Amino acid sequence: MMLKKFATAAGAFAAVTLSATASYAQATTIPGEQVGLAVGAPLPEGIYAIDTFIYRRNDTRFSTDTAINVPVLVWSTGYKFLGANIQPLLAQPTVFGFPNNPAGVPNRDFSVNVGTLVGSIFAWDLGNGLGVSYLAAVHLNDLDAGRGLPQFSSNTYRQGFAASYTADGWNLTANLTHNFYDSPGRFEGAVGRAIGPLYLADALLLDLTATKKFGKFEIGAVAYGVTDLPLGGRNFARASAQGYTRAGRFAVGGLIGYDFGPFTAQLMVARDVAVRTRGTESTDGFIRLIAPLYSAPKAAAVEPVALMRKY
């Protein structure tokens, strides 16, 4: 990967991780990115736009505030594979950094494009409001140059397993996401040669949702967490020499949503209740908009035909 004009800012980027925990946390998927969504339930046939904006404030003094915008397009095709509704998706996350340096040190805001996510959800309707889904996707990190975070030195492969209960206005969803990498990854160019190979730990993320709709309103609780999976043997020693420490966090919060008709809005606030590194707790605020761009026309009702006609 070519660092290009961002090469000089690689040190600043390396200090900001998507999971907002200890340095070199390895999750490319944003923790909490999918809370509030019934990911396990098949979508009605159509095309949907979902935009999630997250602002994260860390308790560490002089730490950089981060904001993440995740726009997603999902096409619920109506086609089946092994009984599952096929739902291709495309996303282009962007991370923004807002430094809070001590007096005398200039602050310089920046943004980083995360690798484009392409993949598909396969969702099964089990009946009685129950649904399960499997996500297979990849963040094409090598296609987006100019970034200095170790997570982006290789493609991120992503799979997800979700279950949802959506009857009677409920959204009870558990979603487990696994990130794994082309490890060791590396950046190209002179800076990449100087840094050398980067040894990346896989990551697990859990998103939990429990909400209820009351008319057009939706109210409930959300929780989410992320942890690195252990690196083995030599890879752990090599990663530790590069500054890697295991990272993880778990946050709990609330959700309120409203159906405006053409689109639905959700607001969420969550706070870390457990972190691997004490003093790195964060508070997250979420804004999400969900809009159907196209809905398949409903089949016309068939009028009954008399068995006998009288002439």
Report each predicted region and the residues it spans.
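Sec/Tat signal peptide C-region and signal peptidase I cleavage site
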Residues: 19-25
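Short loop/turn motifs that connect adjacent beta-strands in outer-membrane beta-barrel proteins
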Residues: 38-46, 77-87, 125-133, 166-170, ...
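Transmembrane beta-strands of outer-membrane beta-barrel proteins
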Residues: 47-49, 84-90, 132-136, 165, ...
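Hydrophobic, lipid-facing positions within transmembrane beta-strands of outer-membrane proteins
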Residues: 33-35, 47-49, 67-73, 114-119, ...
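Transmembrane beta-barrel domains of outer membrane proteins
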Residues: 40, 74-78, 121-123, 160-166, ...
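Outer-membrane beta-barrel pore domains and translocons
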Residues: 54-56, 91-95, 137-141, 177-181, ...
